[in-house]
Amino acid sequence: MSGYILAIDQGTTSTRSMLFDRNMRVVGLGQQEFTQHFPSSGWVEHDAEEIWKSVQSTIRIALAQAGISAADVAAIGITNQRETTVVWDRISGKPVHRAIVWQDRRTAQFCDELKRRNLEPLFTEKTGLLLDPYFSGTKLAWLLNHVPGLRERAQKGQVCFGTIDSWLIYKLTGGKAHVTDATNASRTLIYHIGENRWDDELLDILGIPAAMLPEVKDCAADFGMTDPALFGVSIPILGVAGDQQAAVIGNACFEPGMMKSTYGTGCFALLNTGTDRVTSSNRLLTTIAYRLDGVTTYALEGSIFIAGAAVQWLRDEMGFISVASEVSALAEKADPNQRIYLVPAFTGLGAPYWDAEARGAIFGLTRGTGRAEFARAALESVAYQTFDLLEAMQGDWKGATNHTVLRVDGGMVASDWTMQRLADILNAPVDRPVFLETTVLGAAWLAASRAGIWPDRKGFSERWQRDCRFEPAMPEKERESAIAGWRDSVSRCLTRPQ
């Protein structure tokens, strides 16, 4: 049986390759971690060649596990860590520097300089993003300013810039394709999301030559054919999306007003706003959710820095649990009469506060506070931060209502207790899918639908399966009191008034 779909999920700490059959069942999986480099405080880098090797390795593992050959694969879909920046030689394919990862903060001072020049409104108007080191544009500017001779080579078209998807497509096609998709382009700080083009004015401000930029395609498109020297056959690459946008697709959030939230180390929530390119007044990001058949669908995005990382903190630094899976059972034992708040601003606060200098704190401690109360506070902090995002989205866009259903994925959502508390605090239903690997599923659907093997959007949405719906059950007075306590706690951690 042919018609298998290969989905590559290139993440921040590991690479996974997953094979799906025609019935959307997983038949093979390869996973491999790779090295994290920290050359200086606040700097994070990856070896792009090591990432490429991990992709090749995991593909071979997945094929072997499935017991099929590459000739049985009908199409490839790719999803990737967003914003991470690679520059490589157009002829040799060799990177000129290690990839600068999305977490890297080396361009913070440069971003501050641009803000002092009052340029943030211009960048936000065109890209939907904020002037922050998080995004690719200032990382690329740093490389052009610090790698000897790179600017001249870029002006001559001798080097290529790309996010990880672009780098992998270049390598998979044997250097024949220098392309990206609209979702990854929308995270670079140099792409006009309203006009769907690289923006000359922003390129000029950052000093980036247009000759080094990839062609931007729809998320489901012909991105090129794999080099037959790699796997013995040429396989079409037909789908690409950044990881959070791929999760929107994998959760079948195709209608305006649908929202997904991914809970891993941090949390990323995206709200589908349809063709409305909403400008946030609450410092949320406006981004491209996906572009299909030439039609751009937008989203509001909010990011939380600390979600599952709060549980890791309880385990690794506090020693309250030995494994992360213990935390829910421990939280259930907490004294309901104690109201403890953990504001997990270990690395500042993300949306909608964007306070990099804020630091974590715990409020409400009594002599009776113990491990169980800490566990509950850590899990509740995720719910409260998600509430902050949803409230900001409702303030920005009329389509976000109290009837919004949140579809969730990521490691934390396996906990029934956490999901119920999330529904209670949001006062909104929370849907957990049967298949939790929605990011890689989204990449697979893009490729499979383009190949005509899997159903279209409507058919895929109908096949999306819910494992459980968590309905809000907390009395309104209790909920309002809990949220008031959270707001008071956050206000004490902020370094500037909101």
Swiss-Prot record:
<feature type="binding site">
    <location>
        <position position="265"/>
    </location>
    <ligand>
        <name>ATP</name>
    </ligand>
</feature>
<dbReference type="InterPro" id="IPR018483">
    <property type="entry name" value="Carb_kinase_FGGY_CS"/>
</dbReference>
<dbReference type="GO" id="GO:0005524">
    <property type="term" value="F:ATP binding"/>
</dbReference>
<feature type="binding site">
    <location>
        <position position="12"/>
    </location>
    <ligand>
        <name>sn-glycerol 3-phosphate</name>
    </ligand>
</feature>
<dbReference type="InterPro" id="IPR018485">
    <property type="entry name" value="FGGY_C"/>
</dbReference>
<feature type="binding site">
    <location>
        <position position="82"/>
    </location>
    <ligand>
        <name>sn-glycerol 3-phosphate</name>
    </ligand>
</feature>
<keyword id="KW-0808">Transferase</keyword>
<feature type="binding site">
    <location>
        <position position="308"/>
    </location>
    <ligand>
        <name>ADP</name>
    </ligand>
</feature>
<feature type="binding site">
    <location>
        <position position="312"/>
    </location>
    <ligand>
        <name>ATP</name>
    </ligand>
</feature>
<feature type="binding site">
    <location>
        <position position="308"/>
    </location>
    <ligand>
        <name>ATP</name>
    </ligand>
</feature>
<dbReference type="Pfam" id="PF00370">
    <property type="entry name" value="FGGY_N"/>
</dbReference>
<feature type="binding site">
    <location>
        <position position="244"/>
    </location>
    <ligand>
        <name>glycerol</name>
    </ligand>
</feature>
<dbReference type="GO" id="GO:0006072">
    <property type="term" value="P:glycerol-3-phosphate metabolic process"/>
</dbReference>
<dbReference type="Pfam" id="PF02782">
    <property type="entry name" value="FGGY_C"/>
</dbReference>
<feature type="binding site">
    <location>
        <position position="83"/>
    </location>
    <ligand>
        <name>sn-glycerol 3-phosphate</name>
    </ligand>
</feature>
<keyword id="KW-0067">ATP-binding</keyword>
<dbReference type="InterPro" id="IPR005999">
    <property type="entry name" value="Glycerol_kin"/>
</dbReference>
<feature type="binding site">
    <location>
        <position position="243"/>
    </location>
    <ligand>
        <name>glycerol</name>
    </ligand>
</feature>
<feature type="binding site">
    <location>
        <position position="134"/>
    </location>
    <ligand>
        <name>glycerol</name>
    </ligand>
</feature>
<feature type="binding site">
    <location>
        <position position="14"/>
    </location>
    <ligand>
        <name>ATP</name>
    </ligand>
</feature>
<dbReference type="GO" id="GO:0006071">
    <property type="term" value="P:glycerol metabolic process"/>
</dbReference>
<keyword id="KW-0418">Kinase</keyword>
<feature type="binding site">
    <location>
        <position position="243"/>
    </location>
    <ligand>
        <name>sn-glycerol 3-phosphate</name>
    </ligand>
</feature>
<protein>
    <recommendedName>
        <fullName>Glycerol kinase</fullName>
        <ecNumber>2.7.1.30</ecNumber>
    </recommendedName>
</protein>
<dbReference type="GO" id="GO:0004370">
    <property type="term" value="F:glycerol kinase activity"/>
</dbReference>
<dbReference type="InterPro" id="IPR018484">
    <property type="entry name" value="FGGY_N"/>
</dbReference>
<feature type="binding site">
    <location>
        <position position="13"/>
    </location>
    <ligand>
        <name>ATP</name>
    </ligand>
</feature>
<dbReference type="GO" id="GO:0019563">
    <property type="term" value="P:glycerol catabolic process"/>
</dbReference>
<keyword id="KW-0547">Nucleotide-binding</keyword>
<feature type="binding site">
    <location>
        <position position="12"/>
    </location>
    <ligand>
        <name>ADP</name>
    </ligand>
</feature>
<comment type="function">
    <text>Key enzyme in the regulation of glycerol uptake and metabolism. Catalyzes the phosphorylation of glycerol to yield sn-glycerol 3-phosphate.</text>
</comment>
<feature type="binding site">
    <location>
        <position position="411"/>
    </location>
    <ligand>
        <name>ATP</name>
    </ligand>
</feature>
<dbReference type="GO" id="GO:0005829">
    <property type="term" value="C:cytosol"/>
</dbReference>
<dbReference type="InterPro" id="IPR043129">
    <property type="entry name" value="ATPase_NBD"/>
</dbReference>
<comment type="similarity">
    <text>Belongs to the FGGY kinase family.</text>
</comment>
<feature type="binding site">
    <location>
        <position position="265"/>
    </location>
    <ligand>
        <name>ADP</name>
    </ligand>
</feature>
<comment type="pathway">
    <text>Polyol metabolism; glycerol degradation via glycerol kinase pathway; sn-glycerol 3-phosphate from glycerol: step 1/1.</text>
</comment>
<feature type="binding site">
    <location>
        <position position="82"/>
    </location>
    <ligand>
        <name>glycerol</name>
    </ligand>
</feature>
<feature type="binding site">
    <location>
        <position position="16"/>
    </location>
    <ligand>
        <name>ADP</name>
    </ligand>
</feature>
<dbReference type="InterPro" id="IPR000577">
    <property type="entry name" value="Carb_kinase_FGGY"/>
</dbReference>
<feature type="binding site">
    <location>
        <position position="134"/>
    </location>
    <ligand>
        <name>sn-glycerol 3-phosphate</name>
    </ligand>
</feature>
<feature type="binding site">
    <location>
        <position position="12"/>
    </location>
    <ligand>
        <name>ATP</name>
    </ligand>
</feature>
